[in-house]
């Protein structure tokens, strides 16, 4: 997949996420064999399993103060999306962090997604 196409896809993912349509991004851009590794280091594999984990976290958020896109970069078949987040999670507390989402692309879809802070 060409860098220009990945860049276009990343821009669409960011727009969907910021407009509350993250599920649409999952349907369109994530590979069936996706592996997601979140900030806690836990690996979740398979497209059907990742959204349920995401919904669990999203359902526990009690307040959002900041959710903003801080930048993106594409190099080869890898994209980097930087997010600034500040929100409260039930039974966890405040999560305030700048995180980098690193995505590897295969066949026009994200095959691996890792988060670092």
Can you describe what each PLM-predicted range is?
Residues 72-78, 104-109:
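A short, structured loop/turn motif at beta-sheet edges
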Residues 1-29:
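Short, low-complexity N-terminal intrinsically disordered segments enriched in polar/charged residues
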Residues 31, 90, 105-107:
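Short, acidic, Ser/Thr-enriched surface-loop or helix-capping motifs
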Residues 30, 85-87, 101, 117:
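Short beta-strand segments enriched in hydrophobic/aromatic residues
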Residues 60-62, 86-96:
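Short, cysteine-centered beta-strand-loop-beta hairpins and adjacent loop/turn segments enriched
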Residues 98-117:
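Short beta-strand edge/turn micro-motifs at domain boundaries
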Residues 65-68, 82, 94-101:
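Short, surface-exposed coil-to-beta transition loops
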Residues 4, 23-77:
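A solvent-exposed, acidic/Ser-Thr-rich amphipathic alpha-helical stretch
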């Amino acid at each position: 997949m060409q860098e220009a196409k990945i860049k276009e896809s990343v821009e669409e993912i960011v727009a969907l996420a910021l407009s509350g349509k993250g599920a649409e991004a999952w349907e369109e851009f994530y590979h069936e064999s996706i592996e997601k590794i979140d900030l806690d280091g836990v690996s979740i594999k398979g497209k059907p399993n990742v959204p349920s984990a995401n919904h669990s976290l999203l359902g526990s958020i009690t307040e959002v103060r900041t959710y903003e896109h801080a930048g993106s970069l594409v190099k080869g078949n890898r994209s980097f999306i930087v997010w600034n987040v500040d929100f409260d999670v039930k039974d966890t507390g405040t999560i305030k962090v700048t995180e980098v989402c690193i995505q590897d692309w295969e066949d026009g879809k994200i095959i691996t997604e890792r988060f670092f802070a």
